[in-house]
Amino acid sequence: MQTPKPRPGSLEVPQKKSPASTPKTARKLKTSESDPVSSPNTKIRTPKTQSPKVVADRRSPRTPVNEIQKKRTGKTPELASQISQLQEELKKAKEQLSASEALKKEAQDQAEETKQQLMEINASEDSRIDELRKLSQERDKAWQSELEAMQRQHAMDSAALSSTMNEVQKLKAQLSESENVENLRMELNETLSLVEKLRGELFDAKEGEAQAHEIVSGTEKQLEIANLTLEMLRSDGMKMSEACNSLTTELEQSKSEVRSLEQLVRQLEEEDEARGNANGDSSSVEELKEEINVARQEISQLKSAVEVTERRYHEEYIQSTLQIRTAYEQVDEVKSGYAQREAELGEELKKTKAERDSLHERLMDKEAKLRILVDENEILNSKIKEKEEVYLNLENSLNQNEPEDTGELKKLESDVMELRANLMDKEMELQSVMSQYESLRSEMETMQSEKNKAIDEALAKLGSLTEEADKSGKRAENATEQLGAAQVTNTELEAELRRLKVQCDQWRKAAEAAATMLSGGNNNNNSNGKYVERTGSLESPLRRRNVNMSPYMGETDDELSSPKKKNGSMLKKIGVLLKKSQK
């Protein structure tokens, strides 16, 4: 009988590149190899539906051992290709790990940079707060010195007024002539106009004090607003911390779910190993399919949960950044408002200083006028004394020469009566002027007391404002620290979310690969089950002898006899790869 040549397809199958076709070709080779080893009694037991190629293979005589070894060694490239594929996957996983480490390093560098920036910002804010404190202290000292100077000037003015009052009282006794009455009336009118001007200036000072009170109340309101904003920032920081805690809990839940998936995979591997001796249990395959579907559903749920957490995190991060920007803008606005108010207060102080200088000049003018009046009074007194001497001399002469000088005496008496009447009028005018001076003095004293009270209140308010500014600065520092901690936790959560996403993708790919392997094993089992059942009992003793000759015989026989073992080995490899990626 002629020995038929082996089919070229059995040797060309391992050279194909697609990994999905390897199990089918391996099974075909096994079936073709098992035919020549089988006994010649196969002619009786073979059915009529068998292909002519299989019959021709069975009729062929026994092939030598060297040819069988060559055929067996042809399967080594398949295993080498699978090993190379696994090595490539390992390389890809290592590259992904290196990329994730680089991303972690970049995130750490960015976190350090942000920390340095926050420290610089805190230092600049502390320096600004110290400068503001120094400026406020210097201004308080300047205001106190100005107040003391004003009080001294008021004391000098009161002393000058008292001296002028004494001089006016002296003038009551000294004024005796009618020529200076008109001049005194003019001077009184001028003094009245000056008094009216002083009253207007006092009203202006009152209005300035009211404006200062309004400014202080406005600053207090703005400080309250700033405190409210700081409280809002604190509440936002607490919310951010709560959100971070919720995210951490969600991450822990996802980790527990991943662990449960790992346990499921391990259970599947154990079940595959336990069911390695069974051949073609359809119920176990269906259970495996159901478990794989459940794993897919869990992976999809995990993926959706990770996406939801990422969206929440991005939304919270955007909200926190917006709140931080608004807080910084509010702080800048408050600082600009303080600067504007300081400028306004400086302008008001300059105006008050100018008004004080003008009042001082007017008082000096009044003192000069009073000195002039004193000199004129002295001159008038000297004239009165001279006239009295003349009057005495005339009386003496009248006593000596009464009949001659009666006309002159009458004239002198009439002149004296006129002078007395003029003196009475001047005394009345002086009394009215004195009453006006006393009323003005009382008004000045009341205004001074009100000014002192307003100054004390302003100083107390300034002290409270400085304390509130210190407290607000401390609160701002605490808020910035909380925001920095929240940003650090956010970066850590981002890294964990990315790692979980990578793990979920790896789980999904592993589940898809396992599903494809199981589906391929099922199809091959269903198609070749009958043939294996029919030809499984026709093994020759030659095959049993050659089982231990090659190291790959055990693996190929196991693959042909139980495809579940092959799937279990693939699942084990996938589990090892996932563990390496997690490390």
Swiss-Prot record:
What is the superkingdom listed in this entry's lineage? Eukaryota
**Where are the compositionally biased (Polar residues) regions?**
34-52
The protein's location, in the record's own words, is: Plastid, Chloroplast
Q: Which InterPro entries match?
A: ICR
Keywords, A to Z, come to: Chloroplast, Coiled coil, Phosphoprotein, Plastid, Transit peptide
In the database record, which residues form the transit peptide?
1-55
Compositional bias annotation for Basic and acidic residues: 102-115
Task: Enumerate composition-biased segments (Low complexity).
Answer: 519-529
Q: Which family does it belong to?
A: Belongs to the ICR family.
Protein name from the UniProt record: Interactor of constitutive active ROPs 2, chloroplastic
Which source organism? Answer: Arabidopsis thaliana (Mouse-ear cress)
Annotated gene: ICR2
